[in-house]
Amino acid sequence: MQIRLVSTGKKRFLQLLLLADEQESMIDRYLERGDLYVMYDKLFTEPVAVAVVTDEGKGIRELKNLAVAPHWQRKGYGRQMVEYLCQRYQNVCHTLTVGTGDSHMTISFYQNCGFVYSHNGA
């Protein structure tokens, strides 16, 4: 798998992004100002996963969206994307946070990737 930073035509990945965030209006708010990473299959014919990371200022970056195409799920590609992003941003910021829903499965996934639960934003 190959991961690429996409800087133009980001909306073409909207269907994948909607898997992680059901509100297109919210996606629009962070997509253009964020870095969009796309993981492709080996032949670059199909996007496997997407992630958006935003600059929140003061050395903080936030993983706003992480989605894996349904037929690629539960094969380690989400974790591979998170590991790539952690490595990519380790010298860029001092903190990488995750903004996510409060489902047990999602929180557990990020904790298994090394993130620490800090608070409920509600």
List each model region and its residues.
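Conserved beta-strand in the GNAT
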Residues: 38, 45-55, 59-67
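A short, internal acetyl-CoA/4′-phosphopantetheine-binding micro-motif in the GNAT/acyltransferase core
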Residues: 66-73, 101
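Conserved active-site alpha-helix within GNAT-family acetyltransferase domains
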Residues: 79, 102-122
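N-terminal first-folded block
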Residues: 19-36, 51
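Short amphipathic alpha-helix that is part of the acyltransferase structural core
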Residues: 1-26, 40
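Conserved acetyl-CoA pyrophosphate-binding loop and the N-cap/start of the following alpha-helix
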Residues: 72, 76-84
